[in-house]
A protein has these predicted regions:
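Hydrophobic membrane-insertion alpha-helices, especially the h-region
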Residues: 1-12
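Interaction-surface signature
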Residues: 13, 18-53, 143-172
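Membrane/wall-proximal cationic-aromatic binding patches
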Residues: 21-122, 126
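Conserved beta-strand elements of the Class I
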Residues: 95-99, 134, 162
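A secondary-structure boundary/capping signal
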Residues: 99-100, 137, 167
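A conserved hydrophobic secondary-structure block that centers on an alpha-helix together
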Residues: 120-156
Length: 172
């Protein structure tokens, strides 16, 4: 039965042209990370505010990335991915802090395709009001990092709601 299972898996992988996970070829984000001495206590990794970096991938089978198989990431004035936002939210705006790791950050995903941006667009339309979803996430963060960041910085954004996206590898 093991041989039969392996043969079936091989057929499935060939039929669906599954090539497996491709990690970024280059991680040109070293300059975008704060030195350890500047990190908030209990937070593993943070970005330098107002910076950009690019990750390039081995292939671009769906034509999603740029001509160099890369994707640029913009880090705002708060050291978070996405456009700048005011510390004080506008009256009538529902502000959501979306807390997570690389999944929420959107590694390998254009800004408009991130979970937070999709949620913001969908909720704004559904609720017929201004909704602001803040992408409070960094690749490599665990639940410990998320709680530390939220308590030291994230609550200063005065969210109406905090959503924690929990992926199994976040357990700590």
């Amino acid at each position: 039965s093991l041989l039969c299972t392996l043969v079936c898996l091989e057929v499935v992988f060939r039929v669906f042209d599954w090539r497996g996970y491709h990690a970024p070829r280059t991680r040109d984000w070293g300059h975008a990370l704060l030195p350890e001495t500047d990190l908030l206590p209990g937070v593993f990794r943070q970005f330098v505010p107002n910076t950009e970096f690019e990750l390039a991938y081995d292939s671009n089978p769906r034509g999603y990335f740029d001509s160099n198989n890369g994707l640029r990431y913009r880090i705002n004035k708060f050291g978070l991915r996405g456009p700048d936002f005011a510390l004080e939210k506008e009256a009538g705006t529902l502000r959501i802090v979306l807390l997570g790791d690389s999944f929420v950050f959107g590694e390998g995903v254009k800004w408009q395709d991130t979970l937070g941006e999709q949620l913001e667009v969908a909720l704004s339309a559904k609720l017929d009001r201004s909704v602001e979803v803040l992408n409070v996430a960094v690749g490599g963060w665990s639940t410990v990092d998320e709680i530390a960041y939220l308590s030291q910085r994230g609550l200063h954004f005065k969210p109406d709601l905090v959503l924690v996206v929990y992926v199994l590898n976040d357990a700590e």
